[in-house]
């Protein structure tokens, strides 16, 4: 087995100073996200979503960012999945973007809310047919006897709905409204740059540097 203690790299690609960042964290995120897209990183909108259930047990998984503006970060999923149940019990959640090739991370913390039905409807309608049928066929996070059961359900819903399945009531969007963001840039000697934004009582953002 590979010696885990020997797996390391030196970070040399960039730096991040307080004078470099935008005054608004969403503008700063858009700047970095656009650079990740320009660099042709695979799935730059992939993010880890961390939630905590009613029992206090945390869990995390990769989801895809599907919208982002001054209101927050939007993603879509099954409301009855583990993450959906977690967020119903505890709306506090966190996101993590890791753009390895750029030696960058972005952490986002905040509260999650469901988006309006028309927003969920519009995104659902834009998905490929297979994905729309999959939202019906999968009772997400529940045990299933085998893959053949999923494929049978998908076939049944395809026969039922044809080319125009409606959005299931149990599927839709969430928006994480941020209260804190951190931008991390790898640096040599593990003295990484960490610039954090924290929302103030008046809605403005305070920018601070954190020790690595």
Swiss-Prot record:
Reaction equation(s) it catalyzes: pyridoxamine 5'-phosphate + O2 + H2O = pyridoxal 5'-phosphate + H2O2 + NH4(+); pyridoxine 5'-phosphate + O2 = pyridoxal 5'-phosphate + H2O2
Highest classification ranks of the organism: Bacteria, Pseudomonadati, Pseudomonadota, Betaproteobacteria, Burkholderiales
PROSITE patterns: PYRIDOX_OXIDASE
GO biological process per UniProt: pyridoxine biosynthetic process
Stored InterPro entries: Pyridox_Oxase (IPR000659), Pyridox_Oxase_CS (IPR019740), Pyridox_Oxase_N (IPR011576), Pyridoxamine_oxidase_dimer_C (IPR019576), Split_barrel_FMN-bd (IPR012349)
Cofactor binding note: Binds 1 FMN per subunit.
Alphabetical keyword list: Flavoprotein, FMN, Oxidoreductase, Pyridoxine biosynthesis
Co-factor requirement: FMN
Pathway of action: Cofactor metabolism; pyridoxal 5'-phosphate salvage; pyridoxal 5'-phosphate from pyridoxamine 5'-phosphate: step 1/1; Cofactor metabolism; pyridoxal 5'-phosphate salvage; pyridoxal 5'-phosphate from pyridoxine 5'-phosphate: step 1/1
Enzyme class: oxidoreductase
Subunit structure and binding partners: Homodimer.
EC numbers for this chain: 1.4.3.5
Binding site for FMN: 61-66, 76-77, 82-83, 105, 140-141, 184, 194
Family: Belongs to the pyridoxamine 5'-phosphate oxidase family.
Organism name: Cupriavidus pinatubonensis (strain JMP 134 / LMG 1197)
Protein name from the UniProt record: Pyridoxine/pyridoxamine 5'-phosphate oxidase
GO molecular function, one term: pyridoxamine phosphate oxidase activity
Positions contributing to substrate binding: 8-11, 66, 123, 127, 131, 190-192
Function: Catalyzes the oxidation of either pyridoxine 5'-phosphate (PNP) or pyridoxamine 5'-phosphate (PMP) into pyridoxal 5'-phosphate (PLP).
């Amino acid at each position: 087995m590979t010696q885990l203690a020997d797996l390391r790299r030196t970070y040399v690609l960039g730096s991040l100073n307080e004078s470099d960042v935008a005054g608004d964290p969403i503008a700063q995120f858009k700047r970095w996200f656009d650079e990740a897209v320009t660099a042709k990183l695979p799935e730059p909108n992939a993010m880890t979503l961390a939630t905590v259930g009613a029992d206090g047990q945390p869990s995390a998984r990769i989801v895809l960012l599907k919208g982002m503006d001054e209101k927050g970060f939007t993603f879509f999923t099954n409301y009855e999945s583990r993450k959906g149940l977690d967020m119903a019990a505890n709306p506090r959640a966190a996101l993590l973007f890791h753009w390895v090739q750029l030696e960058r991370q972005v952490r986002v913390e905040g509260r999650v809310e469901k988006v309006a039905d028309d927003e969920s409807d519009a995104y659902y309608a834009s998905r490929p047919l297979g994905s729309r049928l999959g939202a019906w066929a999968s009772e997400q996070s529940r045990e299933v006897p085998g893959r053949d059961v999923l494929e049978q359900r998908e076939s049944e819903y395809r026969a039922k709905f044809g080319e125009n399945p409606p959005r299931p009531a149990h599927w839709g969007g969430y928006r994480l409204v941020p209260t804190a963001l951190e931008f991390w840039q790898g640096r040599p000697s593990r003295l990484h740059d960490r610039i954090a934004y924290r929302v103030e009582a008046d809605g403005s953002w305070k920018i601070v540097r954190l020790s690595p």
